[in-house]
Amino acid sequence: MPPSPHMESENNTIMRTKSYFITLRTIYRRELKGYLGVPFGWVILACTMALQGFILQAVLQIMTQATGNGVMYHMLDNLNFWFYFIFIFPLITMRTLAEEERQGTLEGLLTAPVTTTQIVLGKYFAAYTFYLLLWLPMLLYPLVSDIGNYYTEVRYGIQPEGSITYMLADWVGPYTILALSGAFFVALGILCSAMSRSQIIAAILSTCLMIMYYFIGRVTELWGEFPAAPIFHYLSCTEQVKAFASGVVDTRPFVLYLSLTVFTLALTKRVVDYRRWTR
């Protein structure tokens, strides 16, 4: 008995979906290999680890005073942290599409039997994965410090301030907001790379936009409170990070950053589509 048209339609849909994700995975692996398979990616990782260690050392000196806040709060409230945090994203994303243009491989990619969405998402998820990998060492530094202090207090008969479970839970908020804000900043960097034919210009453009977004949250510090101040408080990445680092988990940053990420990726798709049509 031959299969019904309905079953054939379902099978075709399944096959197309499977083929779509196989192609997306291929692009993702290719791009991720471009980060981990070349010295440039490891240089970024090494520099990030060194800066994280430097900031942790400064934070531990600050914490010799009773502040009532944890290690992660002070690390994210450090100006040096924001300096290198902003500059990480241009380094990660400036090569995604601008480098393809320079090497002459973008022509082949845009004329290949792949959709623009697959290209954008494959590059985005690879860059975002690499960004998340950069924070794994940062998880170990303060965690080892806290656990070491905990067992030292227990050994010398001092009542610990919190359990190890509490310490581990103390990292959930900070890493959540770093993942959320990073999702948007990576998307913004890829958009700048799509708009430029030069890595340097893409890096400068994305850096300027991220610095502008950073200072949006500082408007109330410069001008004080005014009727529109709640909007700037809502957009302030510094206030969000400090709130999450203090253990205050708010749903509004989830909505904000996920919406901005989707919008930026959609805009990137339109830019790549335009470059595809004009070839």
Model feature map: region roles:
Residues C47, L76-E99:
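Long, hydrophobic alpha-helical segments
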Residues P90-L110, Y124:
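Transmembrane helix boundary and interhelical loop/hinge segments in multi-pass membrane proteins
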Residues V59-Y73, M195, A202-V271, W277-R279:
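Terminal transmembrane helical anchor/hairpin motif
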Residues N11-L45:
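Aromatic- and glycine-rich beta-strand/loop motifs that create alpha-glucan
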Residues P39-A50, F125-P137, L205-E221:
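Hydrophobic alpha-helical membrane-insertion segments
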Residues F54-Q57, V71-Y84, A126-R197, V249:
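Secretory targeting signals
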